[in-house]
Amino acid sequence: SHEVTSWIRNMLRAWEADLTARAPAEEKQQVFKAEKAQYRQSKQYLKPLRRALRDGEVDAGVIFSLAEIAKDSGQRRYRAAKEAYMRLAIGNHPWPMGVTFVTFHDRAARHKIGEGAQAHVLDDETTRKYVQMVKRLVTFAERRWPIDPTQEE
């Protein structure tokens, strides 16, 4: 969990440094304002995760996935990091038969199937937010430190 905490801290610091290093003329642009708002939101939504990691309240499987994302992102293996994110977000659960053909009206009772069994970590709102912010950090890292095109993943 220490690796995950330090990766999050380092990514947020790098993002903040990247924003403050921008030209003053750029601060008026809408794109810059949007990115600054994304940074603030990410920092805010990641607080519960950082607190839970510090207090040891995060599930071992989630810590493993987050560590995998942090390691892959740190080594600029962004495709692997995104795959680890997808496994964390939706898991490896196969879709039920015919789920691609479900219409709006079929949904009424279908949501009760398997009720009670948590399918993936995104069922909790706070967890959903910080998992999405982890993906945002990977996207920032990919923009900030792009992979060398001569080295294929």
Where are these predicted regions, by residue range?
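Extended amphipathic alpha-helical scaffold segments
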Residues: 51-57
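Acidic, serine/threonine- and proline-rich intrinsically disordered low-complexity regions
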Residues: 1-51
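Helix-boundary capping/turn motifs
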Residues: 37-44, 57-62, 74
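Short, solvent-exposed segments of well-ordered alpha helices
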Residues: 29, 33-36, 57-60, 121, ...
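Generic surface-pattern signal
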Residues: 13, 17-20, 24, 54, ...
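Predominantly eukaryotic Lys/Arg-rich, low-complexity intrinsically disordered regions
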Residues: 64-153
